[in-house]
């Protein structure tokens, strides 16, 4: 029994509680230790039952999912997987929940679709088992010591005034993330200066609709312009484009973005590898790749392409990663130039861009031993 993942299912729908708890408990590696009908009930049961993982509905009476999550993380920190509907409102709340400490989220399946339900529950079980492996103390540390969000007006690049606010030389920063990524992105992107001499591409493993909410949330917090990428967008310094869910984002001639639905890579679409490889081919040594927290190895091949083109790769370190799978895959292959805690990554991006703005190619720096 000690090897089982102990789960508390929280949902205001009696049907959802019954179906989810019964289906999840069919997995031999999972034990459903209880169910709760709202946030107040959930708080009491989290404290009494001490589950490894809580599945938490977004919309509930008396105490909603976001408030319940905040209370759980403050009073009895536990790995939480949010259950969200594919609606704009739920997507907005889910993004905030991932900032507030939720480990992951899962699209809530229809309780009446028996055919799709079995497949969906299998996916939920995978999320539950992954969440159980998370060191929740890392999440708590990130919540307590995370950098404050701001919309500062400061400039790190005085020379940009000569170019109407945008630098002449343009780097391309590609940030890839998965599990734990939204919280990490909210600690990096808001601190990038508005006149950074780089265009930024963000690839976060998320479904369609949720990436739009993520872009909107980052835009609310940031100095740079942030929005979901659209076909035909142009790379522009001081702008961050988020790859839309279910589409690969690639960059071609004339700094133009295109989207496609080619087969998933590493089981995901959008793929970090796909975006990084296209940018490495297009921008060469002007690439800066950033690999953040996430499961699996997406980004490893992209990092290899960036290194081959003469670019640089920054990787989030293990202590600040919710899941160290993607960063580890890059580090173990020797593709990481810098392995840094989350709090230092923004400054490293800025420093690399400063170097490029000063017209000093990486290869010349490396020859000097810097």
Model feature map: region roles:
Residues 2-8, 14-29, 35, 40-41, ...:
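Conserved acid/base catalytic micro-environments in cytosolic active-site loops
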């Amino acid at each position: 029994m000690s090897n089982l993942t102990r789960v508390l299912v929280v949902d205001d729908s009696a049907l959802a509680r019954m179906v989810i708890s019964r289906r999840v408990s069919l997995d031999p590696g999972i034990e459903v230790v209880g169910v709760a009908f709202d946030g107040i009930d959930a708080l009491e049961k989290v404290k009494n039952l001490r589950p490894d993982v809580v599945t938490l509905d977004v919309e509930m009476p008396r105490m909603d999912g976001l408030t319940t999550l905040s209370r759980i993380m403050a009073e009895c920190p536990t790995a939480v997987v949010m259950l969200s509907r594919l609606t704009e409102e739920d997507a907005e709340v889910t993004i905030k929940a991932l900032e507030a400490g939720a480990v992951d989220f899962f699209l809530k399946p229809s309780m009446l679709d028996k055919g799709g339900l079995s497949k969906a529950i299998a996916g939920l079980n995978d999320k539950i088992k992954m969440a159980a492996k998370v060191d929740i103390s890392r999440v708590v540390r990130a919540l307590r010591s995370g950098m404050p969000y701001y919309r500062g007006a400061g400039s790190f690049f005085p020379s940009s005034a000569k170019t109407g606010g945008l630098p002449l030389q343009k780097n391309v920063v590609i940030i890839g993330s998965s599990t734990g990524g939204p919280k990490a992105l909210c600690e990096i992107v808001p601190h990038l200066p508005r006149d950074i001499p780089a265009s930024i591409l963000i690839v976060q493993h998320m479904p369609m609709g949720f990436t739009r909410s993520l872009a909107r949330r980052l835009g609310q917090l940031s100095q740079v312009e942030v929005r979901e990428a659209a076909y035909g967008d142009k790379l522009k310094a001081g702008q961050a484009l988020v790859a839309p869910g279910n589409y690969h984002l690639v960059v071609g001639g004339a700094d133009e973005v295109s989207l496609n639905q080619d087969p998933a890579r590493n089981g995901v679409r959008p793929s970090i590898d796909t975006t990084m490889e296209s940018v490495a081919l297009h921008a060469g040594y002007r690439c800066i790749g950033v690999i953040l927290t996430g499961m699996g190895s997406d980004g490893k091949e992209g990092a290899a392409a960036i290194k081959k083109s003469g670019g640089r790769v920054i990787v989030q370190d293990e202590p600040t990663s919710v899941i160290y799978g993607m960063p580890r895959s890059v580090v173990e292959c020797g593709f990481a130039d810098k392995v840094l805690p989350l709090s230092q990554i923004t400054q490293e991006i800025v420093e690399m861009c400063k170097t490029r703005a000063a017209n000093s190619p990486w290869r010349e720096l490396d020859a000097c031993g810097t």
